[in-house]
Amino acid sequence: MAEDPGLWTLLERAPIDWKEPWLIGLAVFHILCLIVTYVSFKSYPLQICHFLLMVVLVSCAEYINEFAAMHWRSYSKQQYFDSSGMFISLAFSAPLLCNTIIIVVHWVYKTLCVMTELKTLQQKRKESREKRKKKE
């Protein structure tokens, strides 16, 4: 039985010229988005803006795909943008959605931490009230 090819093998076999400047730029863009996602953990307003910007970009992917399909000759050696939008979904939207998922997971984690802290404070207040009642 044949072994399943790995992700890198599939990427190498794909008819995509990964050395095209715009694809390198797209990769750099996604790396920068990941860095901003990490840095934004320290700044809630930055994180919200970054999250919303990525959601808007994913929402506009269909329009970006149509525009790129009409003008691909001006920046690319071959046409990657088909009517189904598979390439833009994988190369553009999926990494952005991964970043948004990271942010949502961070928000859930922070919420759980705050809820735990709140419950701990409630328990401490309850215990201190009970101690005061016993003293009276």
Curated annotation (Swiss-Prot):
Top-level lineage group: Eukaryota
UniProt KW keywords: Coiled coil, DNA-binding, Membrane, Nucleus, Transmembrane, Transmembrane helix
Nuclear-side positions: 42-43, 106
Region (DNA-binding): 106
Subcellular location field: Nucleus membrane
Any coiled-coil regions, as ranges: 112-136
Main location: nucleus
GO MF term (any one): DNA binding
Any one GO BP annotation for this protein: fat cell differentiation
Matching Pfam families: TMEM18
Membrane topology classification: Multi-pass membrane protein
InterPro entries in alphabetical order: TMEM18
UniProt GO cellular component terms: nuclear membrane
Entry annotated with the keyword Ligase: no
Chain segments annotated as transmembrane: 21-41, 44-64, 85-105
Record topology, Perinuclear space segments: 1-20, 65-84
Assigned protein family: Belongs to the TMEM18 family.
Protein name: Transmembrane protein 18
Originating species: Xenopus tropicalis
